[in-house]
Amino acid sequence: MRKLYDFMEARERLTTITVKTKLLHSDVFSDECGNDVYIKPENLQITGSFKVRGAYNKIAKLTEEEKARGVIAASAGNHAQGVALAAKRLGIKATIVMPKHTPLIKVNATKQYGAEVVLHGEIYDEAYQKAMELQQENGYVFVHPFDDEDVIEGQGTIALEVLAELPDADVLLVPVGGGGIVSGIAAAAKLKNPRIKVIGVEPEGAASALAALKADHPVPLDEVATIADGTAVRQIGETTLEYIKKYVDEIITVSDYELMEAFLLLVEKHKLVAENSGILPLAGLKKLDCKGKKVVAIVSGGNIDVLTISSMINKGLVVRGRIFTFSVNLPDKPGQLVAVSQMLAEADANVIKLDHNQFKNLDRFHEVELQVTVETNGEEHIQSIIDTFKKNGYTIKRLNSSEILSE
């Protein structure tokens, strides 16, 4: 395992390629959890992610003979771009194997950094196997996305930057996927300040670290289901698990709904965009069992496409009670839409969408279903709409988040 001086040497090594992402104080997230919250915005890092730190550190430490052989990696996202840029800066050939259906924007970004891209397989595991075949055939050096001491060492430089800027930080919240970033940050932070608390945050639908800790060894998850695709890892690494067991104080999980809510707050209040995996620590703030502490949330990346941004904002509005969707059964006769409009106006609700469906009910000749989506300003406003309809003799059915968000 790495020592403090190893992380300090890595920090010097990375000065030629990375930027120091300055901490941002967050009033809104502080209010949400009752702590003094700072954001470490690695979404503003070169390539849009922390991954370049570990990739560059690994490749820069190769021997001249290894550099001459070239490097290879398998990735559908941030690791690909980190390896590609690091290799380009160091004048080394890089080959990246990506699943065939990787979004074109990520493929092109990786190519622009100078790497040769090989598209293979439907999922990451198939791309990984292809990368292993090419490594054996061509003698490339494989750069693992997380289960590698040199990669972990590079990611740990984030902790040194945080503690240089905020030496009295009490808690660090770090995303967990394969475990590389939490391993590096936890080790470097604890070696620098043994009293600091490090908490890993992983998706409920991809809790590979918790599963490994319970079994005391890495185990594959039966299913991975999360919107945090960058941390949707079926099995954590062996090396990273040892770091987690030694240095990480706690692992917590967050739901997709909590990610949606955190995304909206980050965009709305800080004018920052981050990928779903990157906001895991922000979503985990409400689950802290402490108050009044200085907490740093590591926002690890910002590579997210425009359509996903739009979807996350809309879903965040639903979760925060800013959009309310409900259904109401109406007599199938003229004038009912007017009555509904009057009740919505009385409740100061601005209509976004109406769906008047005569065929939803079996007895369509007697009543029809109207589904309504309105803008609201929170739960109190939603309740006032419900009460307004009730006093006028209408019973409305509130659609729950899963019904709305699955559409």
Residue ranges and their predicted role:
Residues M1-E407:
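PLP-dependent amino-acid enzyme catalytic core
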